[in-house]
From Swiss-Prot:
Modification comment: Di- and tri-sumoylated in developing retina. PIAS3-mediated sumoylation is required for repression of cone-specific gene expression and rod photoreceptor development. Sumoylation on Lys-186 appears to be the main site.
Domain NR LBD: 170-411
Domain of life: Eukaryota
Ranges annotated as DNA-binding: 36-112
Organism: Bos taurus
Protein name in the entry: Photoreceptor-specific nuclear receptor
Family membership: Belongs to the nuclear hormone receptor family.
InterPro entries listed in its UniProt record: NHR-like_dom_sf, Nucl_hrmn_rcpt_lig-bd, Nuclear_hormone_rcpt_NR2, Nuclear_hrmn_rcpt, Znf_hrmn_rcpt, Znf_NHR/GATA
Function: Orphan nuclear receptor of retinal photoreceptor cells. Transcriptional factor that is an activator of rod development and repressor of cone development. Binds the promoter region of a number of rod- and cone-specific genes, including rhodopsin, M- and S-opsin and rod-specific phosphodiesterase beta subunit. Enhances rhodopsin expression. Represses M- and S-cone opsin expression.
Gene Ontology annotations for the cellular component aspect, listed alphabetically: nucleus
PANTHER family recorded: NUCLEAR HORMONE RECEPTOR
């Protein structure tokens, strides 16, 4: 990776290097650790007693943040039975918190500097009594102005997901892997070692750094774009079904889908593409000053803005984004694939997941699934060359995008 790109994504690169080697169950379990010295939540090595039980630093820190910030979690898979162990503890925050409470962690033991301990409560549907199930709507955060310097913020993270449809075990596993990949790419510097995905009741959104076309604002957009691209590559790598494909197929699929993955990520994480100053300067980014190129740039800009509006109108949720990313990644018609049948099967599974999720969580929107599918072709109306020119040319210079993707993939 070029020095410019390396400088543009230090947080993402640093975070990826901090990942636990056992996330996918590939790391060795600690030896010589008795049951009393293991974390009662995830089974990792305990660092002592935390909030009444033996726990590791990761689970104790997760529990403390959840209680202090009064965080709301939903089981994104919906069954409330996600595995919580060393390799999968970051997969589902709802099930992790549920297990913390079941293991005996004491909420009142959490010291809260901002409010009395009696008001430090955690509200989570999956912890409620099974005899009285009910759903509480989550507060929708105000419109996001754009990613802050701490990293992008998901536009739909606080939206209620509703009940989960019954699905075969194989589909459940596939959905869980998609959500796991989503979780592993939601990074903030303070939580980089655990990859915690949280939803706060009272989020604070900073002012947008993109309100003008100043050099500082443009630099912020280029830096955030590089980070989003890195996260898109990392998301694909974190999909077990993707990493199980022949390496050549992985490279081909990623080179084919990178611009669509980037645009989906930019929309999901609220990069303000609709009023981005880069899009307001077509004469500076159209690759030349000819009238034809300016007209093409203007048309692509209009299509992009219309696409963003359609995503916002549908209020696409995180699970739908995950399924849509999988749909644009797994294209069996891509030339040169060694195993197109396997890729087609993965695309079919992604489509089934999206359909089932839409029916289960938006039962009154009978045409929602179709509308979501119709959003995807519009992402291809903006050429990858145009996306590269707008968001990455200043950062990578003349470095071929294929080389950049390869460097990110190998990182």
């Amino acid at each position: 990776m070029s020095s410019n790109v390396a400088a543009a994504v230090p947080a993402a690169v640093s975070a990826s290097r901090k990942e636990s080697p056992g996330r996918w169950g590939l790391g060795e379990e600690p030896t010589g650790v008795g049951p009393s010295l293991q974390c009662r939540v995830c089974g990792d090595s305990s660092s002592g007693k935390h909030y009444g039980i033996y726990a590791c630093n990761g689970c104790s820190g997760f529990f403390k943040r959840s209680v202090r910030r009064r965080l709301i979690y939903r089981c994104q898979v919906g069954a409330g039975m996600c595995p919580v162990d060393k390799a999968h503890r970051n997969q589902c925050q709802a099930c992790r918190l549920k297990k913390c409470l079941q293991a005996g962690m004491n909420q009142d033991a959490v010291q809260n500097e901002r409010q009395p301990r009696s008001t430090a409560q955690v509200r989570m549907d999956s912890v409620e009594s099974e005899t009285e199930p009910r759903l509480q709507p989550l507060a929708t955060p105000p419109a996001l102005a754009g990613p802050s310097s701490r990293g992008p913020t998901p536009v739909s993270a606080a939206r209620a997901l509703g009940p989960q449809a019954l699905m075969p075990p194989g589909h459940h596993h596939f959905m869980a892997s998609l959500i796991t990949a989503e979780t592993c790419t939601k990074l903030e510097p303070e939580d980089a070692d655990e990859n915690i995905d949280v939803t706060s009741n009272d989020p604070e959104f900073p002012s947008s750094p993109y309100s003008s076309s100043s050099p500082c604002a443009l630099d912020s957009i280029h830096e955030t774009s590089a980070r989003l691209l890195f996260m898109a590559v990392k998301w694909a790598k974190n999909l077990p079904v993707f990493s199980n494909l022949p390496f050549r197929d992985q490279v081909i699929l990623l080179e084919e889908a990178w611009s669509e993955l980037f645009l989906l990520g930019a929309i999901q994480w609220s990069l303000p593409l609709d009023n981005c100053p880069l899009l307001a300067l077509p004469e500076a980014s159209a690759g030349g000053s000819s009238q034809g190129r300016l007209v093409l740039a203007s048309a692509e800009t209009r299509i992009l803005q219309e696409t963003i509006s359609r995503f916002r109108a549908l209020a696409v949720d995180p699970t739908e984004f995950a399924c849509m990313k999988a749909l644009v990644l797994f294209k069996p018609e891509t030339r040169g694939l060694k195993d197109p049948e396997h890729v087609e099967a993965l695309q079919d599974q992604s489509q089934v997941m999206l359909s089932q999720h839409s029916k289960a969580h938006h039962p009154s929107q009978l045409v929602r699934f179709g509308k979501l599918l119709l959003l995807l072709p519009s992402l291809r109306f903006i050429s990858s060359e145009r996306v590269e020119l707008l968001f990455f040319r200043k950062t990578i210079g003349n470095t071929p995008m294929e080389k950049l993707l390869c460097d990110m993939f190998k990182n």
